[in-house]
Amino acid sequence: MTTARYRPTWDLALDPLVSCKLCLGEFPLEQMTTITQCQCVFCTMCLKQYVELLIKEGFETAISCPDSACPKRGHLQENEIECMVATEIMQRYRKLQFEKEVLLDPSRTWCPSSTCQAVCQLKESDTVLPQLVRCSVCTLEFCSACKASWHPDQDCQENVPITSFLPGESSSFFKADDDDAPIKRCPKCKVYIERDEGCAQMMCKNCKHAFCWYCLESLDDDFLLIHYDKGPCRNKLGHSRASVIWHRTQVVGIFAGFGLLLLVASPFLLLATPFVLCCKCKCSKGDDDPLPT
């Protein structure tokens, strides 16, 4: 049986509590973590949950200070992140870092084969022009620009849908997988996306493009997810009918609330417009008056 340790009053006075900007709670200094780059202080539990969420969702590799008003706009260093998270989460963080490095490096590209996913090196002198790339792992030969099979003396076919280069399609270098292939490419920016489980409505972390995982059709304007009510993707969203109805109710409610707010505010806007215009005209007239000599 454990008992609470008695601490004298003067000891408590010398151990002040520090406020966390995330949860607004107050904790002793030993339960707080200071970000080295900006010296902002948060409770260790909140900062740990914040870092883990960003890594699990894959939002960003440069994890910034959670304080939006941070004057130095600091970032957490890799050793600080490693002290907070579990080994498997840290491995995912390093994987995301590597993927971003390859994406931003013009001299490297990913092998387009869904069964390979190796990193291929381009010739440094011709990184801008389409060139033949040969994967050192699977020996696949493809075009560095369009990722299709190498086409010497032919231009890249810009009008060919990107879906023809994706797993599950009739491409010369992709295995004929089913619609549940774990890795596909964004139809807009061609970045590789891995889907573990969950909803079929995907959003590319690179270009923020929303699309259906199965048919790759754009969902940017489909706020009500009508796409999953018909066609080959019907009932493939991955959520129950009740949750879909609740989502649509929320979306309709938001639009209805915005419309109602605009309707209520419109008379006040109409009344205020003449006064605003008069004030602006008066100010501009005052600026045009010559200065007294």
UniProtKB/Swiss-Prot annotation:
> Where in the sequence is the active site?
C199
Zinc-finger (IBR-type) residue ranges come to 91-156
Residues annotated as binding Zn(2+) 2 are C111, C116, C135, C138
Report residues binding Zn(2+) 5.
Answer: C212, C215, H227, C233
Q: Which InterPro entries does the annotation name?
A: E3_UB_ligase_RBR, IBR_dom, TRIAD_supradom, Znf_RING, Znf_RING/FYVE/PHD, Znf_RING_CS
Question: Sorted alphabetically, which Pfam families does this protein's record hold?
Answer: IBR, IBR_1
> Where's it found, cell-wise?
Membrane
Q: Where does Zn(2+) 3 bind?
A: C143, C146, H151, C156
- Binding of Zn(2+) 4: at which residues? C186, C189, C204, C207
Transmembrane stretches in the record are: 251-271
Example GO CC term: the record gives:
membrane
* Name of the protein described by the UniProt record: Probable E3 ubiquitin-protein ligase RNF144A-A
Origin species: Danio rerio
